[in-house]
Structure formats: structure tokens, C-alpha cells
Amino acid sequence: MDQVGRKVVVALDTMGGDRAPDEILLGASVYLRQNPSSVFFRLFGNSSSIERCLSSKANVHLLESCEIIHAGDVVMSDDKLSSAVRKKGSSMYKAVQDVREKASQCVVSAGNTGAFMGISKILLGMLENIYRPAIVTTLPTKKGEVVVLDLGANLDCSSDVLYQFAFMGSAFAKAALGVKNPRVALLNVGVEENKGTDAVKEAFHLLNERTDEDFTFIGYAEPSDVLGGEVDVVVSDGFTGNVMLKTAESIFRLLRDDIVGATRTSLLSRLAGLVLAKSLKKSISRFNPDLRNGAMLIGVNGVAVKAHGGSDSVAFANAIGAAVKLVANNLNSKIIDSICTID
């Protein structure tokens, strides 16, 4: 127990995601190989399926750093929230519950986003004064990093919710990126005040009228402003944010494949590719969504990290890394201290 006590204890929903449980458990192995003796996994899912995966040579070293907790039910990708929360024997439900009971310090799931948000909200509870949780992460820009929320937890948001997201995103930027006075903007189709939905325009006025100094509200931002590094935090509803994220990821993959293909068209291009290999690898790694996997569910009273539903082992390993970093840096407590200033 003392040995486990020195490690970050991570609850894994092994049955959530398109490639569960194989890629989930392989992802845990990948992370453990890269960070030996740093974590202990509590694996929630069908025990027979988990044991089958652990019998693989690729996962053999995981055996000494995990515990299997059987969960006979699974939250499916098309389950409605009302159905998912009733599946109290599911791997997702039991993994989140493990954090509430403080047996684990964080939970990671690649499963149904809406269900994960709802179950986390019910079991972990909301932070004081917060209406809804949001999925938050950082994206690379020309000048560094930008915090983006919401990325899919709430498809439709009122102006009051968007207003709170601004404070939550600012708190995350301060805690995770060390930005002292974040520049916060609302994502919109233009920068003119008369553009946008009613909720966005109302949120604009609420943020303009605030009297605190937690952050600097700079108005609206278009996607080009976001990736150009002109803003530290960008706020949107979950539908818009998720579309922007997935579009950016698909453009990256298109350009990556095109660049790689261009270096193989002739002998000269192959030589150029060899010369530029190190620089290209560095740039591609910075923008690779698989290496940036893992978004925090901010606003709940615990560390809950959502991985992409289609995560492979490398992507899921990075989601685990994101969760471990949140715990190790005590980011949730720092975020809580900052969020408490919301009216």
C-alpha cells in the first residue's frame, strides 16, 4: 500500500471508446513504459476481457501496477444520458465513482462524452456557483498555447453559462499555462458587436459590464485569431467548439500526409526530406492531436479527463499523461481558488 501511495492512482474506464479495451490497456502500458513507477491503475471493465489483454506480451509489465475491478455493464456511444446514469454497474460509472470515494485521484475515459459529463456531474458534484461543467484543453498557436472551452460537453449554452466559461477558462490558463492576466474572447463568425447568436451577444455584454480584474475581455474572436495567438482563452458552446477542434485536427492530418507524400515523390524530394526530418518531426509533433489527447472536465469537484473516442494506444497514453499532470500539479485546487470569484 505504501508503494501505491507514492504513485498517482488513475481510474481507467477500459470499456469506453471505439477501440476498447485493447487500445486502452495498451495505452496504459505505453504510459507506464515511458513513466515507470509513477502511476498505479485501477482498471474498470469486464474482468475476462481485461485479463485477456493483460496476457499479451505488450502488457505484461502492467500486471504489477494495476488492479482489476469488474464492471459488467458498458455505456454505449449512442446511450442517452438518462440511460447511462442508470447503468451503475458500468465501467464508466464505477470509474468515476472511484474518484468520488477517493480510491483514485483521477479518472480517464474515451467513452460517450455526454454520459461522462453527466455521470461526473452527478457523482463528483459541481464546484460552488458553477452551472455546468465544460471540456477544456489547450491548442497550439503561432505564439504558444490557447485555452479552448467548451469542446462538446454542452451543445447549447445560455449567455450566463458562456459568462461562467470565461472565468473557468481564465482560471485554467492561469493554473496550467501561468498566464497572469489572460486575454479572453468569445468565438464568433466576426468581430462586429452585432454578429452572433443572441446568447453570444448577451454574453458579450455581460463580460463587458463586469467590474472584476480576473482577466481582460477582448471581445469576439474568429478562428484565425485563435490559432494566430491573439487570445489566451476562447469561449464557445460545445457544438461550435467541437466542430472547430475536429476541423483543426482534420486539417493537420491532411497537411501532414501531404507533406510526407511530397517528400517521397522523387530522389531530390527524398533528400530534402532527410535534411528537414528533424525540423519537420518537431513541428508535426507540436500539432499532432494524438500527442495532445486528453481534455479536462472543468467545473466538477474532481479530476476527470476525456480522451478522444477513437484514441489508439499512443493517444490514450497522452490522455493519461494529461490526467497525471493535473493531479501532480494540483491544478484542480488552483482552478477552484480562482473560480470562487465568480458572482
From Swiss-Prot:
Enzyme Commission designation:
2.3.1.274
Q: What GO molecular function terms would the record report?
A: phosphate:acyl-[acyl carrier protein] acyltransferase activity
Keyword field = Cytoplasm, Lipid biosynthesis, Lipid metabolism, Phospholipid biosynthesis, Phospholipid metabolism, Transferase
- Give the catalytic activity: a fatty acyl-[ACP] + phosphate = an acyl phosphate + holo-[ACP]
Q: Which residues cross the membrane?
A: none
- Give a yes or no for keyword Coiled coil in this entry: no
Record pathway: Lipid metabolism; phospholipid metabolism
Q: Name one GO cellular component term.
A: cytoplasm
Q: Which InterPro entries match?
A: FA_synthesis (IPR003664), Phospholipid_synth_PlsX-like (IPR012281)
Q: Does the keyword Cytoplasm apply?
A: yes
Subcellular location field? Cytoplasm
User: What domain of life does the native source organism fall in?
Assistant: Bacteria
Q: Which GO terms describe its biological process?
A: fatty acid biosynthetic process; phospholipid biosynthetic process
Q: What does this protein do?
A: Catalyzes the reversible formation of acyl-phosphate (acyl-PO(4)) from acyl-[acyl-carrier-protein] (acyl-ACP). This enzyme utilizes acyl-ACP as fatty acyl donor, but not acyl-CoA.
Name the NCBIfam families on file: plsX
The family note in this entry says: Belongs to the PlsX family.
Subunit architecture:
Homodimer. Probably interacts with PlsY.
> Which PANTHER family does the record cross-reference, listed alphabetically?
FATTY ACID/PHOSPHOLIPID SYNTHESIS PROTEIN PLSX, PHOSPHATE ACYLTRANSFERASE
Q: What is the name attached to this protein's record?
A: Phosphate acyltransferase
UniProt lineage: Bacteria, Pseudomonadati, Pseudomonadota, Alphaproteobacteria, Rickettsiales
